[in-house]
């Protein structure tokens, strides 16, 4: 995977199969994107696809981890930041400011990508505010087609789903109780 990509030489041809699975809902009127750490990378394309309709709440340990704000700013309405050390934006986690944003904003969807503990917290807060929430799960995937079952997860209804085929985006209530 990553090691093979790092050894590629400019001009080399790479075969890619995709996109696979399901993405975030692009029909939302005013979504709030919540990303933490490296989880900000996968939702950047979603922000671009939403053509200024989305706001973003990003969290990181320090201001240095939130270089993403420069990439998101031209694509989104508002950019809100939280850092563990308070070096940029509000000191704390994304869930520190999320309740206030959901109370004041006119959001019809929350999309989250980042550490699982963050996404669980975001899903809980969104549920408390009766706002639909989707999360993007990360699992090691062997085949990407659903055949090998290496990315299988248990849902809240007891069903088994494959992150590669049925996800990686799920309704939060489907994967977090």
Question: Where on the chain are the PLM-derived regions?
Answer:
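Short beta-strand segments
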Residues: 17, 34-35, 57-59, 113, ...
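Hydrophobic, well-structured mid-protein blocks that either form specific transmembrane helices
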Residues: 22-81
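Residues at secondary-structure transition points
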Residues: 2-5, 23-25, 41, 85, ...
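Reductase modules of NAD(P)H-dependent flavoproteins
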Residues: 62-177
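FAD-binding FR-type
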Residues: 1-32
């Amino acid at each position: 995977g990553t090691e093979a990509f790092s050894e590629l030489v400019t001009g080399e041809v790479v075969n890619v199969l995709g996109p696979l699975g399901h993405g975030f809902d692009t029909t939302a009127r005013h979504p709030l994107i919540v990303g933490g750490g490296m989880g900000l990378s996968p939702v950047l394309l979603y922000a671009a696809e939403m053509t200024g309709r989305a706001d973003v709440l990003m969290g990181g340990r320090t201001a240095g981890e939130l270089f993403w704000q420069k990439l998101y700013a031209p694509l989104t309405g508002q950019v809100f930041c939280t850092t563990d050390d308070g070096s940029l934006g509000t000191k704390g986690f994304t869930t520190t400011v999320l309740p206030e944003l959901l109370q004041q904003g006119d959001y019809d969807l929350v999309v989250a990508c980042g550490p699982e503990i963050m996404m669980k917290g975001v899903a809980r807060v969104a549920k408390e505010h009766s706002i639909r929430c989707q999360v993007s799960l990360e699992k090691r995937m062997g085949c990407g087609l659903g055949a090998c079952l290496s990315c299988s997860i248990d849902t809240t209804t007891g069903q088994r789903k494959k992150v590669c085929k049925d996800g990686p985006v799920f309704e939060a209530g489907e994967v977090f109780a």
